[in-house]
Regions:
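Conserved SAM-binding loop
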Residues: 6, 33
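Active-site residues of response regulator receiver
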Residues: 8, 55
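Acidic catalytic/metal-coordinating carboxylates
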Residues: 36-39, 62-65
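Active-site beta3 strand of CheY-like receiver
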Residues: 4, 47-53
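Receiver (REC) domain active-site loop signature in two-component systems and cognate sites
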Residues: 58
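Two-component/phosphorelay signaling modules centered on CheY-like receiver
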Residues: 11-32
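Conserved phosphotransfer cores of two-component systems
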Residues: 45-47, 69-76
Length: 76
């Protein structure tokens, strides 16, 4: 099963995505949610994921900056 991390500063968005997207149909499982980029970056250091779905506009570090840091800090 593919491991999915959802990142959004609005709780209702991450909860809504879990309901609206048929993750199980595509052999995916939401393993964690994060409400900011820093929390997501800390999570992936010890917990590998296959897919990150993120909001672009978040306070502090935005989603694009977060993805760039993930790419630079992870081997694959």
């Amino acid at each position: 099963m593919y491991r999915v991390l959802l990142v959004d500063d609005e709780y209702m968005i991450t909860e809504g995505l879990k309901v609206l997207i048929p993750f199980e149909k595509w052999n995916m499982q939401v393993v964690a949610t994060a409400n900011d980029a820093e929390t997501a970056l800390a999570y992936i250091k010890d917990n590998p994921v296959d897919l990150v779905i993120t909001d672009v506009n978040m306070p502090g570090m935005n989603g694009l900056q977060m993805i760039e840091q993930m790419k630079n800090s992870l081997p694959n």
